[in-house]
Amino acid sequence: MALEHLRIASRRSQLAMVQTNWVKAELEKAHPGLAISVEAMATQGDKILDVALAKIGDKGLFTKELEAQMLVGRAEIAVHSLKDLPTNLPEGLMLGCITEREDPADALVVNSKNAEYTLETLPEGSIVGTSSLRRLAQLRYHYPHLQFKDVRGNVITRLEKLDSGNYDCLILAAAGLSRLGFGDRIHQSIPGNISLHAVGQGALGIECVCDRPEVMELIQVLNHAPTSARCLAERAFLRVLEGGCQVPIGVNTQIEGDTIQLTGMVASLDGKRLIRDEQAGPLADPEAVGRDLAHKLKDQGAGEILQEIFEMERGQ
């Protein structure tokens, strides 16, 4: 039976609404007779702003409330920043499609007094704002002379904190800045040899219920096959390492012909240990490439690093 009304669950943050409204517009364009509504809500991660994300210790900080709406029949799909979506989903839900990825890189954003500097030339003791353990660990490894300070809030709030002098610079996702119209604030795109990006960064994941083939059919117009292959490899890598959103795991994925190559990294929080390797394989089976790379890093000690972090978090 054809679906007449599609309900979308979304976070209510400004970035989330920009992303969800884009999905809504694209679906309306593809399915002119379909009525589409958005149910926006705050998630646990949106409500807890005075505690570092890593200390909250929940893999579904930005997704559980949206998933609950689908599980009780109040929404057919949910739109997520794919990097926020755990690799293991609740029973009855699935990752229906992945949109074309925007720039997945991390970006350096500075205030006016630091406009002359790049990440490499920032003076010793400069205060770098980031809420990501992945960015923190990699930057500590490469730039131990810098100071790192947690920063929470939406993108606009973070930029206000930067411009008021609380930080010398911020590290943010380039895609989020561009989607919100702040692309001109990107001072430097941080290369992958310094900071590998998060799993799924720059792409949107559309989660849906498993037993609604008519919903799956509707949203496939948004699926981008090359991005999907990249992100499936990355998510398989993360799943084997048993890492959530708040662990120092980074990736980069490239496709050449019928081959996909995944680079992956695990680092200690103090930045003193960093394990990095790569794995290539057939594009037809991207998840196998992700799993193989995860086992390769585990053989080099990545599991021990992650176990130390998990034990540290449990003790807090």
Curated annotation (Swiss-Prot):
It holds the Pfam family Porphobil_deam. It comes from the Bacteria. Its cofactor is dipyrromethane. Binds 1 dipyrromethane group covalently. SUPFAM superfamilies: Periplasmic binding protein-like II, Porphobilinogen deaminase (hydroxymethylbilane synthase), C-terminal domain. Keywords: Chlorophyll biosynthesis, Porphyrin biosynthesis, Transferase. The modification S-(dipyrrolylmethanemethyl)cysteine is found at residue 245. One of its GO terms (biological process) is chlorophyll biosynthetic process. GO terms for molecular function: hydroxymethylbilane synthase activity. It catalyses: 4 porphobilinogen + H2O = hydroxymethylbilane + 4 NH4(+). CDD domains: PBP2_HuPBGD_like. Its EC number is 2.5.1.61. InterPro entries: HemC (IPR000860), Porphobilin_deaminase_cofac_BS (IPR022419), Porphobilin_deaminase_N (IPR022417), Porphobilinogen_deaminase_C (IPR022418), Porphobilinogen_deaminase_C_sf (IPR036803). PANTHER family: PORPHOBILINOGEN DEAMINASE. Belongs to the HMBS family. Monomer. The porphobilinogen subunits are added to the dipyrromethane group. Tetrapolymerization of the monopyrrole PBG into the hydroxymethylbilane pre-uroporphyrinogen in several discrete steps. This is Porphobilinogen deaminase. The lineage of its organism: Bacteria, Bacillati, Cyanobacteriota, Cyanophyceae, Synechococcales.
